[in-house]
Structure formats: structure tokens, C-alpha cells
């Protein structure tokens, strides 16, 4: 019995680690490539060791075949990837807002490395992405990440099949909402750009000899960034509230 109990405990811990590890590797913040792999692995292992005794009563017997064992592990990995990917997809709303703001203020050429996107983006998009990660930590949203990991075993127990259709629908909905939110967050700068371009067009039409381009470009950058600075508090509050609503689905 002792040998069976030990084998069963290892089996449960492996399943929990498969789900938690997949979630941690795809979640915002802790799952970024900028975080050393050892830290991410250690965090996932610690969470697995904590959760394994709590959920072992809901786990079925150890499969008698290698295929059954592999299927159980893949099942857990897919659920972890589903939850973590949805949480990361919503982070693109800030990147979208930053890209739109950069286009409206003629700053699209200013590229920088964006750790959260694992690639390059405009400087404004990178700044807003870093702002999002800061807000996650400052407003304790990362606690809801941990709550989502724990609650996932109630929403998606070991015996339930992977909800592929629901996961695909949620991913599409999250992408649509993140893009819509990105446009909304950039709305003040979009309105400013429309008014500013209309005004400069009228000035250029009235005074053709006036070199409007040399005045409009720096003025667009200064006024656009000033408006962004004034809008940051509103952007932070709206984005945090919307992200909290998304996390409520899993908590």
C-alpha cells in the first residue's frame, strides 16, 4: 500500500505540475521570457507541491497503459495553456493602444524591445505594456492569477474533457475585446489627431507658402504625448477594471 500511495502521489504531482507549469509559462509577468527559466520552473513546482495534496481526492486511478498516462498529462497541459493564453491575449490591448497612439503622433519609427511581446514594438507600446505589468503587481491582480490556478481544478476537473469549442470561442472573444479596448484607450489621441490634422490642413490651404510640415510634426508629438500623459490615470483604471472582469471568469 505504501508503494502504491507513493506512486499515486507522484502521479498526482505530475498532473498538477503539467497544468500549473503550462499556465505559468504563458501567463503575463511570470511567464515572460525576461524572467529566468529557473524562477518560472521553481514557481510552478512550488505551486504543484502545494496544490497536489488538495486535489488528489479528485484524481482517478493511475492509467494502466502508457497511452493513458500520456493522455492525462496532455489533458492537463492543454487546460493550462488555454487559461494562461487567454490571460496573456488580453495584454495585447495595451500594445494595440500604444501602436495606435504611435501612429497618430508620428512615433511609429521609434522601435524598442518589448519583453512582454517577445519582440519589438513602438516605444509607446512598450511603455504601456510595462505599465500593464506594473498595474498587475501593484493592484494585486497577480493574486487572482494564483486564485485562477486553484479554481481551475473546480471549473476543469481531471475527469472533464478539454472544452475545445469553449476555449476557441473564449480566445476569439478575448482578442476582439482586447482590440476594442485598445482602440478605446487610444481614443483621446485619435480624436486629437483628427482635429490636429484637420487644422493643419486648413492652415496649409489658407497659407500655401507656409511650411506647415516643419511645425506640425514636432507639435503633433508634443501635444500627443502631453495628452497621453494626462490620460494615463484613466487608461490605468479602465484597463485594470476590464482585466479584473476577465479574471473573474476563472475565479
Swiss-Prot record:
It holds the Pfam family Bac_export_1. It is a multi-pass membrane protein. It comes from the Bacteria. GO terms for biological process: bacterial-type flagellum assembly; protein targeting. It is found in: Cell membrane; Bacterial flagellum basal body. Keywords: Bacterial flagellum, Cell membrane, Membrane, Transmembrane, Transmembrane helix. One of its GO terms (cellular component) is bacterial-type flagellum basal body. The chain crosses the membrane at residues 10-30, 43-63, 67-87, 130-150, 183-203, 212-232. InterPro entries: FliR, T3SS_IM_R. The keyword Repeat does not apply. Belongs to the FliR/MopE/SpaR family. Role in flagellar biosynthesis. This is Flagellar biosynthetic protein FliR. The lineage of its organism: Bacteria, Pseudomonadati, Pseudomonadota, Alphaproteobacteria, Caulobacterales.
Amino acid at each position: 500500500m505504501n508503494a502504491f500511495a507513493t506512486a499515486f502521489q507522484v502521479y498526482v504531482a505530475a498532473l498538477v505540475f503539467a497544468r500549473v507549469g503550462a499556465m505559468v509559462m504563458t501567463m503575463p509577468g511570470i511567464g515572460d521570457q525576461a524572467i529566468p527559466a529557473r524562477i518560472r520552473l521553481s514557481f510552478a513546482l512550488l505551486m504543484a507541491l502545494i496544490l497536489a495534496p488538495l486535489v488528489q481526492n479528485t484524481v482517478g486511478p493511475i492509467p494502466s497503459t502508457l497511452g493513458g498516462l500520456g493522455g492525462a498529462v496532455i489533458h492537463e497541459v492543454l487546460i493550462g495553456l488555454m487559461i494562461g493564453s487567454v490571460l496573456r491575449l488580453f495584454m495585447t490591448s495595451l500594445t494595440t493602444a500604444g501602436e495606435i497612439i504611435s501612429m497618430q503622433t508620428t512615433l511609429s519609427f521609434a522601435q524598442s524591445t518589448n519583453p512582454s511581446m517577445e519582440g519589438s514594438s513602438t516605444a509607446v507600446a512598450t511603455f504601456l505594456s510595462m505599465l500593464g505589468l506594473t498595474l498587475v503587481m501593484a493592484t494585486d491582480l497577480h493574486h487572482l492569477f494564483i486564485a485562477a490556478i486553484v479554481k481551475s481544478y473546480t471549473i476543469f476537473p481531471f475527469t472533464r474533457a478539454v472544452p475545445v469549442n469553449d476555449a476557441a470561442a473564449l480566445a476569439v472573444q478575448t482578442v476582439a475585446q482586447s482590440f476594442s479596448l485598445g482602440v478605446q484607450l487610444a481614443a483621446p489621441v485619435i480624436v486629437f489627431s483628427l482635429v490636429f490634422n484637420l487644422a493643419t490642413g486648413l492652415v496649409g490651404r489658407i497659407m500655401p507658402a507656409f511650411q506647415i510640415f516643419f511645425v506640425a510634426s514636432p507639435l503633433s508629438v508634443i501635444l500627443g504625448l502631453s495628452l497621453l500623459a494626462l490620460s494615463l490615470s484613466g487608461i490605468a483604471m479602465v484597463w485594470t477594471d476590464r482585466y479584473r472582469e476577465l479574471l473573474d471568469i476563472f475565479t
